[in-house]
């Protein structure tokens, strides 16, 4: 059997977003860990919906692929010309 093969397994205190603490065992090298999102405030567990910044994501997509607001109107003009 090999010695020193597995990482150290020690107690860690996890502090949840609401301030409560849980003590468990982990291979983490720190004695404590703070979470921002957990089951007390995550929308999946609470049933509350949160607004996601989709507008920022759309703008990022348009910047990445070179689309601008002016390009959106060009499709309609092309379709009108094709109908004539």
Curated annotation (Swiss-Prot):
GO terms for biological process: translation. InterPro entries: Ribosomal_bL28/bL31-like_sf (IPR034704), Ribosomal_bL31 (IPR002150), Ribosomal_bL31_A (IPR027491), Ribosomal_bL31_sf (IPR042105). GO terms for cellular component: ribonucleoprotein complex; ribosome. It comes from the Bacteria. Residues 1-41, 63-84 are annotated as: Disordered. One of its GO terms (molecular function) is rRNA binding. Keywords: Ribonucleoprotein, Ribosomal protein, RNA-binding, rRNA-binding. Residues 21-30 have a biased composition (Polar residues). Transmembrane segments: none annotated. Residues 68-84 have a biased composition (Acidic residues). Part of the 50S ribosomal subunit. Binds the 23S rRNA. This is Large ribosomal subunit protein bL31.
């Amino acid at each position: 059997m090999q010695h020193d093969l597995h990482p150290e397994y020690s107690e860690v205190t996890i502090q949840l977003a609401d301030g409560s603490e849980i003590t468990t065992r982990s291979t983490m090298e720190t004695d404590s860990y703070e979470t921002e999102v957990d089951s007390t405030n995550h929308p999946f567990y609470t049933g509350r919906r949160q607004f996601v910044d989709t507008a920022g994501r759309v703008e990022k997509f348009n910047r990445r692929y070179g689309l601008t607001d002016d390009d959106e109107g060009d499709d309609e003009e092309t379709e009108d010309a094709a109908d004539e």
